[in-house]
Amino acid sequence: MIRVAVITLGCPKNQVESEYMLGILEKNHLEVVSDPRQAEVVIINTCSFITAAREEALDTILELARAANHPRLIVAGCLAQQYASELWQELPEAAAFIGPGATGRLPEIINRVLKGERVLDVPGPEMITGELPRLIEDGKPFAYLKIAEGCNNRCTYCTIPSIKGPYRSRPLEKVVAEAVSLAARGIKELVLVAQDTTAYGLDCYGEYRLPELLRRLARIEGIEWVRLLYAYPTRITPELIEVMATEPGVVPYLDLPLQHASEGVLRRMGRPGTGAAGLRAIESLRRAIPEITIRSTFIVGFPGEEEEDFQILLDFLTDARLDWVGAFKFSPEEGTIAASLPGQVPEEVKEERYQRLMLHQQSITRACNEGWLGREVQVLKEGPEVGRSMRQAPEVDGVVYVKGDPSPAGSMVTVKLTQLYNIYDFLGEIKL
């Protein structure tokens, strides 16, 4: 039996695509191994969103090429989609370059590379609609659920529309069917992802259908939590807020990437609104859902960002009191408008502002978390003595450590939060 390993780089959306790959491999009787050193073929599912992601992908490919077992390498994902023709010449170490649209042909491609053939299979942007099998790690209590592909927003710094194509919603019934299948396999939490989850439905139904989708998913037997990531600020509709406020299975949590608070910087980014508009949106959410947890991400060092703009961002964070914040240093991406804008910020200034922002936010996050000490919360176990509360999205926020709790992954337990382990993580006691 042919042994195949899959390495996933990048975002949760890539994780979903890797799980489809694993499902296809298993269905076609190929042996899936977790250790690439034991594999005859290694598939690297890459990201190319920013320079650092491309560098990580190339380093991974070259490291695997030097491995003692000399596996055949298949480069998949965004890097292959965007740069296949260049990489074909520059990376002879790779046996194949495939785009997401070639996922269904993986068994055939593997057979071809094992016969010594090099393969280039990068069709135009396509979407997996849900017919493919999906293999999820045993014992994992959550799954990312991709509801759309592509993006119609035109942020000046972003390559996603050119890589992934225009926004395409998956049919609602197919999303629900996949969710039912996941629940039947023991998944307790669905984490909705897309380039823009809040645009769901507009392209194929002529109206936003995310509220309806959330209701349907939250009422699936076996699903405890439905969590929403990658929301767009101007699409937080009253209907969406109502569903989040009234549907018990939809967790009071929203990932709302705002990117900046300075009006001038936002305008150069091609993003809507102002810092004041962002604050109003946050206040509306908190009025309707008093205990909502809000996460956001920001870019520092965007072209033209002056110290005054950066201070506006810090002041916004002080006023917004966001629970969780991630930040990126601007990376000029080939083919984007932002890469050629005047006023490029020196790398050392980007780094200094990044450090200041994260330090500034740490005290806010600590204060938010301290406000939960002494309270009892539901925790979804992810392993021995560790899990997450509703306030914590997988892999990006903190966790709750529950000493002496023997319940397995997937269990829902009541925990009293007793102290902070660090800024982001809690210690808790099981409540029997």
UniProtKB/Swiss-Prot annotation:
Residues 2-115 form the MTTase N-terminal domain. [4Fe-4S] cluster 2 binds at residues 151, 155, 158. Its main location: cytoplasm. Its EC number is 2.8.4.4. It catalyses: L-aspartate(89)-[ribosomal protein uS12]-hydrogen + (sulfur carrier)-SH + AH2 + 2 S-adenosyl-L-methionine = 3-methylsulfanyl-L-aspartate(89)-[ribosomal protein uS12]-hydrogen + (sulfur carrier)-H + 5'-deoxyadenosine + L-methionine + A + S-adenosyl-L-homocysteine + 2 H(+). Keywords: 4Fe-4S, Cytoplasm, Iron, Iron-sulfur, Metal-binding, S-adenosyl-L-methionine, Transferase. PROSITE patterns: MTTASE_N (PS51449), MTTASE_RADICAL (PS01278), RADICAL_SAM (PS51918). Coiled coil: none annotated. [4Fe-4S] cluster 1 binds at residues 11, 47, 78. Its cofactor is [4Fe-4S] cluster. It comes from Moorella thermoacetica (strain ATCC 39073 / JCM 9320). GO terms for biological process: tRNA modification. The keyword Cytoplasm applies. Belongs to the methylthiotransferase family. RimO subfamily. GO terms for cellular component: cytosol. InterPro entries: Elp3/MiaA/NifB-like_rSAM, Methylthiotransferase, Methylthiotransferase_CS, Methylthiotransferase_N, Methylthiotransferase_N_sf, NA-bd_OB-fold, Ribosomal_uS12_MeSTrfase_RimO, rSAM. Disulfide bonds: none annotated. This is Ribosomal protein uS12 methylthiotransferase RimO.
